[in-house]
Amino acid sequence: MFRYLVYSWIFSSSLSLCEIPLAAAVIAYYSFDEALGNETVYGVDASEEALWASDMARGPGVQPSLGSGTFSARQWSRSGLDMEDYFSFTLAPLPGFELTIDQIQWNERRSSSGVRQWLWRCSLDDYTLNIGGVHTIPDNDLTRHQTLPLPSDTFTRLDEAITFRLYGYMAESSQGTWRIDDLRLEGTVSAVPEPSGIHATIALLVLFSILKRNRAPQSNFETTSTFQDEMSV
């Protein structure tokens, strides 16, 4: 009976060591439904309980502009990338939690003389590398839906704040506008797992010891039984 109790404990301990990944969901959402477009900052509509999400903001190089139901700006760079021309927001998991971000989805629209290129960067490398490359916007004023998949080797199990910046440049006029809408982040926010490596090692050692101990007596018993049978013939 004791052996079966130990096996049961080892099995249940092994299950507790397994991490079952959660399905990705919307963890933060900026709708801008009630926005005029020219607010200095605009708050998040919803976010996971264990996740803090900042207001949406602009870089110091651009100016607010009107755009009902969006978050808009003008004075974008008319040439190459300007590190002060961007939209930005920050995410931070609460203590004891970690953040995985799978992708960003949003809508964007330029005026007829707005930006022609955009890219994302983040604070993990001090805004040095592009995330997903440089993207060119068609020369029209249509609303487009964009999706940016994030590499799992960089944006998995983050336990500190991260700031994203969406840069726009190559505007056809300094008065040309560019606006974003309906921005959502998909991923998971989960509790930091307890350190479990030592528990797994102990469980395996106990199992090995039990199996070895039980196998040895069984072998001796079979040998003795066979010997006694031969003697009785």
List where the protein language model places each region.
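Boundary/junction segments of secreted and surface-exposed precursor proteins
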Residues: 21-40
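Surface-exposed, low-complexity/disordered Ser/Thr/Gly/Pro/Asn-rich loops and linkers
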Residues: 56-92
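Extended extracellular/luminal ectodomain segments enriched in beta-structured repeat modules
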Residues: 94-103
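Extended, low-complexity, turn-rich repeat/linker tracts enriched in Gly/Pro/Ser/Thr and Asp/Glu
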Residues: 95, 108-117
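Short, surface-exposed beta-strand/strand-loop-strand elements in extracellular ectodomains
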Residues: 116-126
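Terminal, low-complexity interaction segments
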Residues: 133-191
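A short, hydrophobic C-terminal helix/tail in secreted or cell-surface proteins
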Residues: 194-212
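C-terminal membrane-anchoring or membrane-association module
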Residues: 209-233
